[in-house]
């Protein structure tokens, strides 16, 4: 499963009603042929991959064939690279395409690297492990991008039992996760609703329950605890920063441990406010545009440039794929840096840099465009955000234009992952929409 069907297909369903009228064109075009789905040799080859990891191999083969792709690039986070060679062998065996693996680090969906793939001569990119966060250029008809979420099945019964043993009945719980576990999360929420006041919050354009390291929803005050399904703390800390007064728990699906988690909000905010205070007396500014895939936002960079120009503050532009203290120390004449790449780099590692390293939001505070916010905003990719120092600011209004597909839940079952409306331009649309069973 990779995303919702195309907007025109969804609109056709709403006009004709479920199960009535002509089949939507999007579904017919994207339906995987039986000769691929039922190919015994392909099914045998897929058995080499972990059975609980859904790499959507038949769908990938069909999309490559549809596009008549000649050279395919695969991009995936390091945790999935051990499966790359197997996937390459399968795709080259069952398609006419040459397949290559892009080995540069991939931190998230913001790192989708169609630029490098094109430069290497690829006409098709498969991006694994992340949702459709970055819109693709619809004018490039000779290049296609397919997002594969890599849905991971886990021991859902153990997750449910752990929650029941930890929280008393009728507790108000918010469940969040990364895209790999969102289907399991939403199905678990359905099971728990009879015993708890369960919510699966959404921060559009993300799927219900999905959070990023830089983007998380602000939860209602009545929520007593947030439960994060996933390994590691990076994404969990995002929702903790956005909701400092709500207890946070993490269920690791690999160790099968449900643990209480804590975050030093006071220390983090003190460090960031100190950096902002120092920046206000800066005489020269440096603007960093991240070049790791699509991580950098030219729109935000242009906004920062216009603000500094209006205030008569000199600045220099710097393009970097990864930002290290040693690199910035080579430009000692710059008094303060603003990085348009990953906000968490400043939040988590800002004190490691010799000069203040601000996020675009913190730069807005330093330039007095906005006051310091409580709680600290985690809205970098949110459609509804504080200002033009975020990627999708104003997009919530664009999504209300008549004829556009509204983002939300699929009726008749647990909500499916839903990409941004601009995802109509990429190749990640599903051929089916159906609830995921426990």
From Swiss-Prot:
PTM-bearing positions, type Phosphoserine: 418
What are the alphabetically sorted keywords of the record? Cytoplasm, Iron, Iron-sulfur, Metal-binding, Nucleus, Phosphoprotein, S-adenosyl-L-methionine, Transferase
**Where located?**
Nucleus; Cytoplasm
| Statement: the UniProt record of this protein carries the keyword Ribonucleoprotein | no
Can you provide one Gene Ontology molecular function annotated for this UniProt record?
4 iron, 4 sulfur cluster binding
Q: Name one GO biological process term.
A: protein histidyl modification to diphthamide
Explain how, and how many, cofactor molecules are bound. Binds 1 [4Fe-4S] cluster per subunit. The cluster is coordinated with 3 cysteines and an exchangeable S-adenosyl-L-methionine.
Requisite cofactors: [4Fe-4S] cluster
Record's catalysed reaction(s): L-histidyl-[translation elongation factor 2] + S-adenosyl-L-methionine = 2-[(3S)-amino-3-carboxypropyl]-L-histidyl-[translation elongation factor 2] + S-methyl-5'-thioadenosine + H(+)
So which domain of life are we looking at?
Eukaryota
A Gene Ontology CC term for this entry? cytoplasm
Binding-site positions, [4Fe-4S] cluster = 110, 214, 342
Gene3D superfamilies assigned to the protein according to its UniProt record, in alphabetical order: Diphthamide synthesis DPH1/DPH2 domain 1, Diphthamide synthesis DPH1/DPH2 domain 2, Diphthamide synthesis DPH1/DPH2 domain 3
Metabolic or biological pathway, per its Swiss-Prot or TrEMBL entry: Protein modification; peptidyl-diphthamide biosynthesis
Q: What class of enzyme is it?
A: transferase
Assigned EC number: 2.5.1.108
Q: Which InterPro entries match?
A: DPH1/DPH2, DPH1/DPH2_1, DPH1/DPH2_2, DPH1/DPH2_3
- Keyword Amino-acid biosynthesis part of the UniProt annotation: no
Its family remark reads: Belongs to the DPH1/DPH2 family. DPH1 subfamily.
Subunit and interaction comment: Component of the 2-(3-amino-3-carboxypropyl)histidine synthase complex composed of DPH1, DPH2, DPH3 and a NADH-dependent reductase. Interacts with DPH2 and RBM8A.
Q: Record's PANTHER family?
A: 2-(3-AMINO-3-CARBOXYPROPYL)HISTIDINE SYNTHASE SUBUNIT 1, DIPHTHAMIDE BIOSYNTHESIS PROTEIN
Function field:
Catalyzes the first step of diphthamide biosynthesis, a post-translational modification of histidine which occurs in elongation factor 2. DPH1 and DPH2 transfer a 3-amino-3-carboxypropyl (ACP) group from S-adenosyl-L-methionine (SAM) to a histidine residue, the reaction is assisted by a reduction system comprising DPH3 and a NADH-dependent reductase.
Q: What is this protein called?
A: 2-(3-amino-3-carboxypropyl)histidine synthase subunit 1
Q: Which organism is it from?
A: Bos taurus
């Amino acid at each position: 499963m990779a995303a919702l069907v195309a907007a025109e297909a969804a609109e056709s369903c709403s006009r004709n009603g479920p199960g009535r009228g002509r089949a939507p064109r999007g579904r017919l075009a994207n339906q995987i042929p039986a000769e691929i789905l039922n190919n015994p040799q392909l099914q045998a080859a897929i058995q080499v991959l972990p059975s609980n990891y859904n790499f959507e191999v038949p769908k990938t083969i069909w999309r490559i064939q549809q596009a008549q792709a000649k050279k395919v690039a695969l991009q995936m986070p390091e945790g999935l690279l051990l499966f790359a060679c197997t996937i390459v062998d399968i795709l080259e065996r069952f398609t006419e395409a040459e397949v290559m693996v892009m080995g540069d680090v991939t931190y998230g969906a913001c790192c989708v690297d169609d630029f490098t793939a094109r430069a290497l001569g690829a006409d098709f990119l498969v991006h694994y492990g992340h949702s459709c966060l970055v819109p693709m250029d619809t004018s490039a008809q000779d290049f296609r991008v397919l997002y594969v979420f890599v849905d991971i099945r886990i021991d859902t019964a153990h997750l449910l039992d752990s929650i029941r043993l930890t929280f008393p009945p009728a507790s108000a719980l918010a469940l969040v996760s990364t895209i790999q576990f969102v289907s399991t999360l939403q199905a678990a929420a359905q099971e728990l609703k009879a015993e708890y006041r369960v919510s699966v919050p959404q921060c559009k354009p993300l799927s219900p329950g999905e959070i990023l390291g830089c983007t998380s929803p602000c939860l209602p005050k009545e929520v007593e605890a947030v439960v994060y399904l996933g390994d590691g703390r990076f994404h969990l800390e995002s929702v903790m920063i956005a909701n400092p007064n709500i207890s946070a728990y993490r269920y690791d699906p690999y160790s099968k441990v449900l643990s209480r988690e804590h975050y030093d909000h006071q220390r983090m905010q003190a460090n960031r406010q100190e950096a902002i205070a120092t920046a206000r007396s800066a005489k020269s500014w440096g603007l960093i545009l991240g070049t790791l895939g699509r991580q950098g936002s030219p729109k935000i960079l242009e906004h920062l440039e216009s603000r500094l120009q209006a205030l008569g503050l000199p600045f220099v532009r710097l393009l970097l794929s990864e930002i290290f203290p040693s690199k910035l120390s080579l430009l000692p004449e710059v008094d303060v840096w603003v990085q348009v790449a990953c906000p968490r780099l400043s939040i988590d590692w800002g004190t490691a840099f010799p000069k203040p390293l601000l996020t675009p939001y913190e730069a807005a505070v330093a330039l007095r465009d906005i006051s310091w916010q409580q709680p600290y905003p985690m809205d970098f990719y949110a459609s509804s955000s504080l200002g033009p120092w975020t990627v999708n600011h104003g997009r919530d209004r664009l999504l209300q234009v008549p004829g556009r597909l509204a983002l939300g839940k699929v009726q008749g079952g647990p909500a499916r992952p839903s990409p941004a409306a601009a995802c109509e331009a990429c190749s990640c649309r599903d051929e089916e929409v159906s609830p995921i069973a426990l």
